[in-house]
Amino acid sequence: YDRATGRLLLEFGSERYEPQRDGTWDVTRPSVRFHLSDGNIIRMSADTGRVIMSTAATERQIASGQGGMPSRGEMREVTIELFDHPDAAAPRLTCNVPILSFDNDTYRIATEAAVVDGKLVPADRIPVRVRGEDVEFDGYGLVLRWNGLDGRLDSLEIIHGERLTIRNPSRVLPESDSAASRRVVPAMYAQADGHVAPAPQPAPDDNPRVAYRAAFEQDVVVLEGDAQVATATQLLVDLLSEARVEPAAAAEPDPTGDVIAPPSDRRRDRTTPVEPETAPQDAAPLPVTVRWTGKLRVAPLAADQPAPPTADDYIVQLVGSPVSLARDGAEAVCGRLVYRTADESIALEPSADAPIVELTDADGVSLRTTRVIVDRSKGIATLDGNGRAKFPVRGDDGRTDLLTADWRDGCVVGLSDDGRVVQSATLNGAVSILHPRVNLAADQLDLAFDPPAEKPAADHRDERGAAGTLRQLRATGSVSGNILDDEARPAAIASRVLVLDIGTDPAG
């Protein structure tokens, strides 16, 4: 128990205790329950074990529960289960490990070297297997440190990573609110004097959620279904610990003695609103798998961490030299990718090893710049600083020409509602345009695109990032240059505004 508050922290029990000559105790079916400050329960059980008691005790005292707690020991064929609350009927996550040691004085749990199938396996190669409704995890070697005073995790380390699969990402990550209609607006209450007062605020949480960072290190590969979509040196996920989940009603034993949880005890999706059963269901998202070869480290974030995660906003980062992305025919290379779940915004940033952000799509559009921020809620992508873009343009006789545009002061790209199609682009500052028939300089350039042509039914490639066909070019400011006419004769241009509508005649 916590001596200051009286809160239950830890329970230990075993079906059988056998004293040994060296002062240790062999235990059968030992079980330890950790009571977390957020209401969750961690239960660690094993087939057998050997423990050292914190105080000298007789066998009778041990059997009667008066012999104190083990100070340290070792357990074999261990199962660790995470429950949402003490009365939960089933665990949310289950971890299986062949052998673990524990030390209640230092609150440390770790894998130990063991003989498996006649061979000595080092501690960092003992398999660690985790399964849950939406999660599968495989790695090797475990070191866990517990904060007994605060009732929370201090650190967790998997020595060698292998695989993490999230079968349904929408049930694990918080739901985004990128659509304005889904944003939460504080309720306002009218007072008697006609003024409007803000809604009353909830009472402070006496069990605040802890912000953690999970760091997957070395040779990171991300797959969506069977398709590889990203590679990086490191994957970082900033998130909050789970909120307290209270049971709606106490569980009642049935005549057989088994615990029956009330229907409301079944864990619901914590991030997705419950919809009527008649509501149309979207196709299930593909599972996401992360593979890596180095360590997985989980630890609390520093209190002064800038832009920390919130309950609705987890932060996912890919860091590499460089980070490479590929999906639906589109590719990107950058030094760092930052994704925020609340608004589904994406930032592609440079690094010392990858100073330029490069993007290409399956339709021939390419972009080079120093930084890109995609804001799905506003339907725009902002390219910072100077850059270069290349766009396919319809040419004579059905051929495709390339228009190259350079700029100095940034570019704003307009996206379709689903963020998959480029509809427009505005280039600012010392803009230059180069095309087989056009050579121009301007202060600003606006480009408008036709929607991409529909693909045949057999072509399942997604339109993500497609720019369609350039329909109009509008140059403003100090516009100068030349344009070739149909006879390839140059015509000099000097104006404040120039608009070119691009298309083909019936002859192509």
Question: PLM features: residue spans?
Answer:
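Mature-chain termini and adjacent capping regions
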Residues: 1-508
